[in-house]
Amino acid sequence: MTQYARPDADTSVGNWAASSGSSRYAMIDESSADDSDYISVSSMGSAETIVLGLSDVDTPDSGTRTVVVRAYEDSGFNSVQLDVTLKEGSTSKGSQSFSSGFDSVANLSFNITSSISDYSNLNLTISATDPMGMGTAYVYQAYFSVPDAAAEEVTTSPAFLLFVD
């Protein structure tokens, strides 16, 4: 079974806006993609960054660990670059730049190969840059998926018998 670390806190929102309400993380934390709520940022001549805390997951068994961001850019020129970074505290554990392929709603993903020691201290940084300053970047969903937790080792002890007379 898979575990999901989903946004559960707005750590630093910059100029990113929520489609409704004030919590950005609540717009993109759903387990099933919902394109009716989102976060967005417009007219970014320079990088616009949001940092989101992620929910805790148990230390996983070995297997593929993947960051997924469901996004769209509407510049009409495919000019928005989205940089996504998974961090443990302030240390980058993996990042990917996406500069094309999301001029329609798309799931952008990459695998994490670096080791992570504390799965309760993860955050996701998303930066959008449009050198033309004409586009809007939308993010509809974001999460980090990991395998199920490793099975606990069962320890057995030899039987102990006590006879009382």
For each feature predicted by the language model, list its residue ranges:
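Short beta-strand-plus-loop segments that form exposed binding edges in beta-rich domains
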Residues: T125-G133
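Extracellular carbohydrate recognition and processing domains
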Residues: S92-S115
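Disordered, acidic Ser/Thr/Pro-rich linker "stalks" and the adjacent N-terminal cap
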Residues: Q3-M44
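Edge beta-strands of jelly-roll/beta-sandwich modules across compartments, strongly enriched
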Residues: M132-S145
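Extracellular beta-rich ligand/substrate-recognition surface
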Residues: S32-I50, F98-F102, G133
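A short beta-strand element within beta-rich, extracytoplasmic domains
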Residues: E48-G76, L124
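Short, surface-exposed beta-strand/strand-loop-strand elements in extracellular ectodomains
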Residues: N78-G89
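Enriched but not universal
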Residues: M1-N15, S19-S20, Y143-D165
